[in-house]
Amino acid sequence: MVLQLGKLETEDIIATGKALQALAYVDPNRIGIMGWSYGGFMASLAITKGADIFKMAIAVAPVTNWRYYDNIYTERFMRTPAENEAGYDGNSPINFVDKMKGKFFLIHGSADDNVHYQNSMEMINALVKANKQFDLFIYPDRNHGIYGGNTRNHLFTMMFDYVLKNL
């Protein structure tokens, strides 16, 4: 994990996906992944680096480039970008979107003060540049928790429906 946030976790997730594919009672064409925050980062890496395994991913408020995340947290594990460019680039989903094959749903709150909205904007730019189709939903003025009013109900209903439709 040191100097390589996401590398070993992604390898584990892909290995788990492969193990699931080998089970007689699992449809290998219906394996998906979802996550929020760091989990959204992992889902984004899984659908790109594990493109042959995962047919769908939902990423809520994902880190897509460690250069945009809280430097006190990130540099504790990764050092600075100048000291560890390979660690930053080798584990940022934006650098692997060309491999993506499955359905991808990106969700973010525009007022997120933890994983800044810029992460999703960077992912969108990378996906468009690679001519990858994806789904996107932005919650205006919602923070990292995406809650308030009917927001949480809306979010979970939308994610549930996405899984039903795409797996």
Each model region followed by its residue ranges:
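Active-site-proximal cap/loop segments of hydrolase catalytic domains
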Residues: 1-167
